Amino acid sequence: TTEIYTLSLHDALPICNTPHIKLIYAIPTFQNPTGKTWSLERRRKLAELSAKYGVAVIEDNPYGELRFEGESLPSIKSFDEAGNILCTGSFSKIFCPGFRIGWIAGDKEIIRKYVLVKQGTDLQCNTIAQMTIAEYLKRYDIDKHIAKIVEVYRKRRNVAIESIERYFPDTIKFTRPEGGLFTWIELPEGISARDVLVRSLEKKIAFVPGGSFYPNGNKENTLRINYSNMPEDKIEKGLKTLGEVVKEYISQSK
C-alpha cells in the first residue's frame, strides 16, 4: 500500500509560541527522504504560523523542478507577508551534482547578512562552477534540459514503484512520489532496516536506513530508496533482490 507521512502543523502551534524555537526548516516538495509533497493548505498555514509567531522558515527546494505528474504548487515563500521566509534552490539536481551551486530568495536585509556570513565562512562559491553554469544558461535552454531529465527520472520512478509492488511483501507501506529522487518504505513494526541492509549488502544492494534521518534513531523499520542513478533494468533487478531479502528476514523474524 502507499501512504504519505505528514507533519502536524496543529502540533506545531504550541511549539512555535515558545522562545526556544527560532527556525523551521522544510522541504515541502518531493522531500528527502520520503518523497512526500505538502499540500497548498499546509504551505499557506506554515507561512501564517511564521508571520504570527515571528519564526523564520528556510524552504529548501532542490527537487521542485523534477515533477513527473500532478499540479505544481506555489512555494511557501509566495505566501510570506512578514519577510520571515527564505527559499533556496540548487543546480546540483537539475544540472550537475558536483557543482554545489544554488540560490536563495528572501528579504533584502536578511540576504545582506547572509552574504557577510558567507564571506566569513569560505569567501565565495566555486568560481569555475559558477562561470560554467552561467555560460550554459547563455547558450542552451535549461528548461528543455530539465524536461529531458524529468522524463528519464519518471521512467525510473515508475519501474521502482512497480518493482516494489511486485516483489515486496504486502505488509509494507511506501510513498509514490510525484517527482524528485526518492521513495520511502516502511517495513512491519519490529523489523530492523539496518539488519536488512547487512543482508542486502551481501548481495551488493544498498539503501539508506530510515533511522539515519531521525536525530533519536526512531523509525528503525524504514528505509529510503534512491532511483535516480541506475538504468531501469538494474532498478528492477536490485529491488527484486531487496524484496527477496525483506521477505526472508520477515519470515525468519516471526
Task: Kindly label every feature range from the protein language model.
Residues 1-6:
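Short, exposed "boundary/linker" segments that immediately precede the start
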